[in-house]
């Protein structure tokens, strides 16, 4: 990466970490263990659309590892990596298909994130019974993906003429 690109990547990483921390401070209880709004994923969506696939992957992994060490634990990193990587893969594929807006891509990512975490939970606790959470997690992923997608759509509209590269 060149100087400007590194600086912009650093800003997005810092914002993602700030959003991760802010999310810890928001006392929202969805009644689902580990469920969060996914505010930091807003930065991943923005980087995917403004900087590219490699940069978005680097941001996602960097944010997950750093926020895991700063605010969580090793299991949290494991769950977040599973969800984050599956979410990233789904968002890249949906974005490349060109038939969904950023909102649809974000909904797909939010849903995939929860599925990835559920799959890891099944392996960790060695039972498929945690799969009973799937319907609730799918709805939660759709709702949070929708919210993040709507914010991303608005931000992208406002920074449309700004070159980040």
Language-model features and meaning:
Residues 6-11, 42, 46, 54-61, ...:
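Hydrophobic alpha-helical transmembrane segments
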Residues 39-53, 90-95:
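Generic transmembrane alpha-helix motif of multi-pass integral membrane proteins
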Residues 12-19, 48, 59, 63, ...:
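Alpha-helical transmembrane segments in multi-pass membrane proteins
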Residues 73, 77-78, 97-165:
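Membrane-embedded alpha-helical hairpins and interfacial helices in multi-pass inner-membrane proteins
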Residues 20-37, 62-91, 102, 124-129, ...:
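Interfacial aromatic-anchored transmembrane helix boundaries in multi-pass membrane proteins
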Residues 43, 66, 70, 116-119:
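Transmembrane-helix signature of multi-pass solute transporters
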Residues 1-46:
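Hydrophobic transmembrane alpha-helices
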């Amino acid at each position: 990466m060149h100087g400007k690109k590194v600086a912009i990547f650093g800003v997005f990483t810092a914002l993602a970490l700030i959003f991760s921390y802010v999310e810890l401070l928001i006392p929202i209880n969805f009644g689902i263990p580990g469920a969060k709004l996914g505010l930091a994923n807003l930065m991943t969506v923005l980087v995917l659309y403004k900087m590219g696939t490699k940069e978005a992957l680097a941001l996602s992994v960097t944010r997950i590892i750093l926020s895991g060490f700063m605010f969580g634990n090793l299991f949290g990193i494991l769950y977040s990596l599973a969800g984050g990587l599956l979410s990233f893969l789904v968002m890249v594929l949906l974005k490349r298909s060109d038939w969904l807006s950023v909102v649809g891509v974000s909904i797909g990512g939010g849903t995939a994130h929860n599925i990835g975490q559920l799959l890891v939970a099944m392996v960790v606790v060695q039972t498929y019974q945690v799969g009973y959470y799937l319907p609730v997690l799918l709805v939660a992923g759709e709702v949070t993906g929708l919210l993040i997608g709507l914010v991303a759509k608005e931000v992208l509209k406002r920074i449309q003429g700004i070159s980040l590269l």
